[in-house]
């Protein structure tokens, strides 16, 4: 249905405008400049700065363009004396208390207040009284405050309330005593908080990690892609003297709109960590020695060749991070298969691979990211969407805000989402399949169809409650023409993932919903396309004989590892097994940007590679969209782009097809394998492994938002946030009573034969029989599987 148009006149020119639109929206579309401070296209209208006053005929006084709906026949003057006088008066009032410290302000040169003052302000102020001073607040390690500069536009307040879902900043006081603050002295904790830096029209809120490092006009801006979650947020990288100074969002309405997560904004700090490796290293007689690239390649080739001749190519395995570029993923799997091994995997945290042969060509969202705003119902399965994919959580929040979308979940904890949840099933990790079976039973009853035969026994034995029925009713409602069953990291990394996937597919099928995945990393989807899995080559072509998956590689039978961009002790599903496998292998070569103490103990050769901002490459996001990025700064020291390192190493083996001279050459080659791919999440196995739930207390080892990959772990500012301070044991009070841990501060954690001592926190969000102990941390690196039986005792 087309919208009704009316005609208005602005500065003598007629324009068609949608009925009910705000005047400032119409003038912006027409290219007519009207100054503003409080108005932002993504926020609600507050009309409190009064900078956008314009002259509307027949109105007794100037009207704010941001809050004035257009009417048919309206005549507006933006350049009349009445409008100009109103704007100049407003500008003078706004500058009364401003410190005018532009020469030392980080916002200088890109400040809306500067620009508007130059265009609409006077050259002499009538104000001669004392300016007020507002003492700064420490609101955390990410955002620097200078509230004396604040003009009370309230953009930051509305952002927290409307976008982040956490009203952490607010206006305190009235009139000349009004201040923006947190009311209670505390840090801003939202995973999207850094966006207030961009929307602040003055220098009141700036990026703390880059404070006083550079002026806006000194920096060079490069378009790039965020290298962490699978949204593929568009970013700008700002550099000075061949160094990354800061990261800012790049507008893309189809993907990230105008926002980025704090992880994407501040992770660049990790590039300059003290443990950055900048020179090839070779272990000689137990000592690490710097060497030239050619020598390092020769040493690596000789060692691998010796092992292949003695034990066969199948004794060599490779693990690669899914944050790597598509070019790196493709070349590594091509090299591995060139030497005769299919032992390559990027699914390092997954433990159940029993149905991998029937997995989709790549796990994907099943729709465009922007269409999430239109969904009517979503079931989150094993999905902490707010921390795993902050931008996707924002899209779901918009669906809830705009048309009251129904959100429900099946999770091992109440993850404190930033949107309204209608029904939440909090269950212990081993009983997730039982809850899903009950949902599948309710769904089949609703649809009148039978469940898949291999699930019949489990589903028929399930007990359906009113909560299950309400979730199914929401998914299959006539209003829910767009409903989604969305699998997250907890589901994919669950010991019974194949069963969870089959049950989720049944729920989706019987409610006519879309089965969706939110892949963990920036190239988790791309890694499947590139062939970085043991059972498929590039483009999804099935190999004749499947290699070892990531879990099987840790059994102790692999003689040589080629690790790319990973820390096995923090990236693998079983950290203890990963460390053991590395130590027992005859040879380990690591291609990495960072070196750790653990790595120095088990590795034999370390080859320094470039980080995301130092190399060109391609990322495939969760909707299957390919995006390229270029290098913005030179690799530190003697580090080299990963795809070049792989190409040269492959040449050492005299393999064919490794003569690419640019990353684009690699990409064009890979595209030839992906031209006819059909994406379908509904392809599932017709049988799954026997299901038997473990009894007793179980560990839930979610990976915290700032522990997911090598770069973000080294971002100093992010590691000072509350989301990074999570190295503790969390159980609910009921479980604490059962385990006799009430009023205990520290506990001894035992998993398999490994023990550690950690702080105990009572958290009522955790399900019964679950013990939350995060994975991906140094403190938990030696424990064992992220999901499994565990013992917690009083010290």
Task: Give a label for each model feature.
Residues 2-28, 36, 40, 55-59, ...:
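N-terminal export/assembly segments and adjacent metallocofactor-ligating motifs
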Residues 34, 39, 315, 333, ...:
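A cross-kingdom feature strongest in bacterial/archaeal respiratory oxidoreductases
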Residues 205-211, 244-246, 314, 318, ...:
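Acidic/polar loop patches that form or flank catalytic/metal-binding clefts of enzymes
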Residues 339-340, 403, 419-421, 503, ...:
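Short, structured coil segments at secondary-structure junctions
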Residues 341-355, 405-413, 510-526, 585-596:
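A generic structural motif
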Residues 411-413, 418-450, 497-500, 506, ...:
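Short alpha-helices
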Residues 422-426, 433-491:
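Phosphate/pyrophosphate-binding active-site segments
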Residues 478-555:
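A glycine-rich, hydrophobic/aromatic-adjacent loop/helix-cap motif
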């Amino acid at each position: 249905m087309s919208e009704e148009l009316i005609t208005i006149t602005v500065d003598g020119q007629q324009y068609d405008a949608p009925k009910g639109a705000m005047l400032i929206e119409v003038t912006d579309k027409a290219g007519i400049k009207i100054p503003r401070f409080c108005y932002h296209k993504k926020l609600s209208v507050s009309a409190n700065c009064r900078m956008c006053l314009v002259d509307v005929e027949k109105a007794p006084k100037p009207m704010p363009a941001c809050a004035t709906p257009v009417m048919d026949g309206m005549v507006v003057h933006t350049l009349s004396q009445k409008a100009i006088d109103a704007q100049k008066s407003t500008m003078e009032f706004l500058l009364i208390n401003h410190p005018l410290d532009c020469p030392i302000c980080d916002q200088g040169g890109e400040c809306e207040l500067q620009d508007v003052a130059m265009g609409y302000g006077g050259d002499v102020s009538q104000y001669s009284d004392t300016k007020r001073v507002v003492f700064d607040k420490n609101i955390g390690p990410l955002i620097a405050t200078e509230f004396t500069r604040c003009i009370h536009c309230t953009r930051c307040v509305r952002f927290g309330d409307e976008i982040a879902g956490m009203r952490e900043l607010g206006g305190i006081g009235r009139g000349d005593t009004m201040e923006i603050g947190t009311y209670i002295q505390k840090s801003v904790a939202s995973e999207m908080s850094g966006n207030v830096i961009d929307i602040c029209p003055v220098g009141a809120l700036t990026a703390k990690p880059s404070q006083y490092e550079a002026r806006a006009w000194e920096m060079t801006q490069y378009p790039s892609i965020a290298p962490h979650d699978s949204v593929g947020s568009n970013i700008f990288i700002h550099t000075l003297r061949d160094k990354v100074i800061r990261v800012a969002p790049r507008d893309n309405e189809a993907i990230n709109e105008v926002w980025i997560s704090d992880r994407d904004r501040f992770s660049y700090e990790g590039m300059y960590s003290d443990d950055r490796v900048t020179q090839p290293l070779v272990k000689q007689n137990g000592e690490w020695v710097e060497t030239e690239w050619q020598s390092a390649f020769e040493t690596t080739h000789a060692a691998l060749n010796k092992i292949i001749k003695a034990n066969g190519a199948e004794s060599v395995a490779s693990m690669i991070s899914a944050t790597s570029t598509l070019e790196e993923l493709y070349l590594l799997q091509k090299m591995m298969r060139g030497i005769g091994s299919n032992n390559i995997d990027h699914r390092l945290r997954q433990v159940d691979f029993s149905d991998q042969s029937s997995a989709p060509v790549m796990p994907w969202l099943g729709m465009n990211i922007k269409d999430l705003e239109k969904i009517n119902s979503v079931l989150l399965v094993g999905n902490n969407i707010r921390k795993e994919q902050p931008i996707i959580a924002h899209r779901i929040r918009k669906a809830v805000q705009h048309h009251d979308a129904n959100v429900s979940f099946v999770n091992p904890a109440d993850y404190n989402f930033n949107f309204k949840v209608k029904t939440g099933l909090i269950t212990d990790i081993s009983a997730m399949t039982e809850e899903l079976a009950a949902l599948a039973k309710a769904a089949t009853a609703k649809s009148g169809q039978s469940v898949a035969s291999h699930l019949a026994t489990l589903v028929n034995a399930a007990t359906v409650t009113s909560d299950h029925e309400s979730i199914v009713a929401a998914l299959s409602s006539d209003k829910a023409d767009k409903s989604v069953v969305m699998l997250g990291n907890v589901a994919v990394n669950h010991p019974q993932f194949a069963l969870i996937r089959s049950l989720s597919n049944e729920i989706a099928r019987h409610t006519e919903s879309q089965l969706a995945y939110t892949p963990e990393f920036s190239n988790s989807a791309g890694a499947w396309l590139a062939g970085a899995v043991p059972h498929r080559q590039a483009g999804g072509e099935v190999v004749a004989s499947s290699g070892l998956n990531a879990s099987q590689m840790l059994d102790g039978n692999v003689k040589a590892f080629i690790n790319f961009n990973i820390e096995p002790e923090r990236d693998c599903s079983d950290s203890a097994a990963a460390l053991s496998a590395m130590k027992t292998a005859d040879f380990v070569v690591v291609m990495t940007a960072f070196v750790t103490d653990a790595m120095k103990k088990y590795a034999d050769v370390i080859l320094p590679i470039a980080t995301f901002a130092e190399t060109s490459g391609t990322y495939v996001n969760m909707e299957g969209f390919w995006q390229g990025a270029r290098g913005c700064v030179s690799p530190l020291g003697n580090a080299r782009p990963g795809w070049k390192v792989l190409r040269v190493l492959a040449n050492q083996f005299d393999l064919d097809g490794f003569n690419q001279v640019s990353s684009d050459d690699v990409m064009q080659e890979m595209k030839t394998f992906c031209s006819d791919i059909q994406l379908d999440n509904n392809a599932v196995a017709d049988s799954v492994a026997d299901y038997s739930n473990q009894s007793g207390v179980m560990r839930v080892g979610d990976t915290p938002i700032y522990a997911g990959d090598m770069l973000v772990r080294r971002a100093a500012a992010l590691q000072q946030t509350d989301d990074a301070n999570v190295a503790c044991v969390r159980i609910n009070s009921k479980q604490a009573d059962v385990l006799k841990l009430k009023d205990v501060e520290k506990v001894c954690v035992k998993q398999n034969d490994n023990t550690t001592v950690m702080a105990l926190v009572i958290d009522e969000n955790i399900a019964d029989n679950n013990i939350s102990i995060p994975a991906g941390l140094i403190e938990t690196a030696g424990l064992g599987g992220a999901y499994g039986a565990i013992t917690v005792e009083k010290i």
